[in-house]
């Protein structure tokens, strides 16, 4: 069942976002640049004014400059005025383009930075709720859509509206009777073009959807090429690719048919308008009511007005696309931040941990059962406690409460006798190192990965790598600790990736360690190196470990056995085996698997 993304939501608590609401949200970003924006708009107004200048120069030239008896002054000043007008237009056009792009790029920078900062400071529940592609799309791509509304619609409304106003004003000045006729016919042209454009927009959306589906098929086939080949899936993949390609071709042809109608029909209706104007103009000229120059200037201005009118009619499409993008962007910006905590400083904890009647639920299940239910235990400084139990018993949820990825629904978690919310969140997390079975490495150097979150000190990096039994491997690499590990450490083996994650925890030197042991199979040599690195890491630290290896469980000072969100057994390895309960059952199953 598909789940509707929660990141995109109407802005300002409305049922649907409106341009006015979006502009109010954008105003704080625009305000520091308002005078730059005003200058850009004025430059656009100058560009619009020059549109009416061209037909205005044709009239005196045709009326007074042509023929042997033409006025010499008119013959000289009109060409000079054309050059001057073109120069003024070019300068104004460049100025408006530069100034508006300056505003656009500055707002883009501010929005992206704020979005990334908010994303990185949201709670863990946000990352569990939203897909990575949704967040990436919002931060990287959708910002451009909002700025397309801000700049594109602004340019269209200002430049083309002013162009229409100037040209209509000039038309009324030349001949108000003919202008009234044009004013009646032009909306008909606009209605027809708008209807064709609506169909084109729908076809474009469907075409884009099919294009994305086609790209996804290629991506799936390339990424899963081994499965495709082993299962002889080539005919299936070729079949669905060909089917979608044929659909795509059909939509392309329908777009060609619809798009091809727009220009001929527009030209046909414009020709009707022109024929009506010509007829009336001939009648008026017979009665000496118009001149050749006035007629040519009128027709030129009439033809020039069609393009900006079309742009104004098409403004709704980018506007609606921008509204959708704005909902995604401000949905991210409005996400609540993680709680900062009470601000109590914590330089270095002794490592004492206490869970007191802790309950937690991600959302009540149908039977009303919670993920953790009234869990209580203490861990002494330097003690190693292993968490065991079947899948879904609450082990990972329990350790996630310690760095405050989540807060308990009831009860409290304490470090050194102080409830976690009282500590500064940054100071609290400085006390905790975490090594997960899902190793996360960044596309950076080995040194940067080891010292992640801190400035790399080469001596400390070397010491951490030695302690993790990885130093000899690193020194054999061409660039040593400056070697790039690739996307999530793809240039390293599985065992090397795990040891690099352990080296990162050693470098942090936190008094509390959370260890989720890897279940992935390693060769015996890698297993030996990883086990030795873990022993070094756990030495002298308070350790909570979600144990998968028998050797780790047996070495723990105490084992807590969870089932259904409750601690059902507690004791040492030997004590729990003697009890013959759930732990003994799990141990027997794993021992048989290991023996097998």
UniProtKB/Swiss-Prot annotation:
Pfam families: ABC_membrane (PF00664), ABC_tran (PF00005). SUPFAM superfamilies: ABC transporter transmembrane region (SSF90123), P-loop containing nucleoside triphosphate hydrolases (SSF52540). It is an enzyme of class 7 (translocase). It comes from the Bacteria. It is a multi-pass membrane protein. Residues 353-589 form the ABC transporter domain. One of its GO terms (cellular component) is plasma membrane. Residues 38-321 form the ABC transmembrane type-1 domain. Its EC number is 7.5.2.6. It catalyses: ATP + H2O + lipid A-core oligosaccharideSide 1 = ADP + phosphate + lipid A-core oligosaccharideSide 2. Belongs to the ABC transporter superfamily. Lipid exporter (TC 3.A.1.106) family. Homodimer. Involved in lipopolysaccharide (LPS) biosynthesis. Translocates lipid A-core from the inner to the outer leaflet of the inner membrane. Transmembrane domains (TMD) form a pore in the inner membrane and the ATP-binding domain (NBD) is responsible for energy generation. This is ATP-dependent lipid A-core flippase. It comes from Burkholderia mallei (strain ATCC 23344). The gene is msbA.
């Amino acid at each position: 069942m598909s789940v509707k993304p929660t990141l995109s939501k109407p802005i300002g608590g409305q049922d649907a976002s409106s341009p006015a609401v979006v502009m109010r949200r954008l105003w704080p970003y625009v305000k520091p640049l308002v005078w730059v924006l005003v200058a850009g708009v004025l430059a656009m107004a100058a560009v619009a004014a020059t549109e009416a200048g061209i037909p205005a120069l044709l009239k005196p030239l045709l009326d007074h400059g042509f023929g042997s008896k033409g006025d010499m002054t008119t013959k000289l000043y009109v060409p000079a005025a054309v050059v001057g007008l073109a120069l003024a237009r070019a300068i104004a056009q460049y100025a408006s383009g530069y100034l508006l792009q300056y505003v656009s790029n500055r707002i883009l920078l501010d929005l992206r930075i704020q979005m990334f900062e908010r994303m990185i400071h949201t709670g863990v529940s946000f990352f569990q709720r939203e897909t990575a592609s949704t967040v990436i799309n919002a931060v990287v791509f959708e910002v451009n859509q909002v700025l397309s509304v801000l700049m594109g619609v602004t340019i269209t409304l200002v430049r083309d509206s002013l162009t229409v106003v100037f040209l209509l004003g000039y038309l009324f000045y030349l001949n108000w009777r003919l202008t009234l006729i044009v004013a009646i016919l032009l909306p008909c042209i606009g209605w027809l073009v708008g209807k064709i454009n609506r169909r084109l927009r729908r076809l474009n959306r469907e075409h884009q959807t099919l294009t994305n589906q086609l790209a996804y098929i290629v991506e799936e086939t390339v990424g899963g090429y081994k499965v495709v080949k082993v299962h002889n899936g080539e005919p299936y993949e070729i079949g669905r690719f060909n089917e979608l390609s044929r659909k795509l071709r059909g939509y392309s042809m329908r777009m060609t048919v619809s798009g091809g109608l727009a220009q001929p029909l527009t030209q046909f209706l414009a020709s009707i308008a022109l024929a009506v104007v010509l007829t009336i103009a001939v009648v008026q000229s017979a009665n000496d009511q118009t001149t050749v120059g006035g007629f040519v200037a009128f027709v030129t201005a009439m033809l020039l007005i069609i393009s900006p009118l079309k742009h104004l009619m098409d403004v709704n499409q980018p506007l609606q696309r921008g509204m959708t993008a704005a909902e995604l962007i401000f949905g991210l910006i409005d996400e609540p931040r993680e709680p900062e905590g009470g601000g109590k400083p914590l330089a270095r904890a002794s490592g004492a941990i206490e869970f007191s009647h802790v309950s937690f639920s991600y959302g009540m299940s149908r039977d009303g059962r919670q993920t953790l239910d009234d869990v209580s235990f203490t861990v002494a400084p330097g003690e190693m406690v292993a968490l065991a139990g079947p899948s879904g018993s609450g082990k990972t949820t329990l350790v996630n409460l310690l760095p405050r990825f989540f807060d308990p629904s009831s009860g409290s978690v304490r470090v050194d006798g102080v409830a976690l919310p009282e500590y500064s969140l940054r100071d609290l997390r400085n006390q905790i190192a975490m090594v997960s079975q899902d190793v996360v490495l960044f596309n950076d150097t080995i040194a940067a990965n080891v010292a992640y979150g801190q400035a790399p000190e080469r001596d400390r990096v070397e010491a951490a790598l030695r302690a993790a039994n990885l130093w000899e491997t690193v020194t054999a690499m061409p660039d040593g600790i400056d070697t790039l590990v690739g996307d999530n450490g793809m240039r390293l083996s599985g065992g090397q990736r795990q040891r690099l994650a352990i080296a990162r925890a050693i470098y942090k030197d936190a008094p509390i360690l959370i260890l989720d042991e890897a279940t992935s199979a390693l060769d015996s040599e890698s297993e030996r190196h990883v086990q030795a690195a873990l022993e070094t890491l756990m030495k002298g630290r308070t350790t909570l470990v979600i144990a998968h290896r028998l050797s780790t469980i047996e070495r723990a000072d105490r084992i807590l056995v969870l089932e259904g969100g409750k601690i059902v057994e507690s004791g040492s390895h030997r004590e729990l085996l003697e009890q013959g309960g759930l732990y003994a059952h799990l141990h027997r199953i794993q021992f048989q698997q290991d023996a097998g």
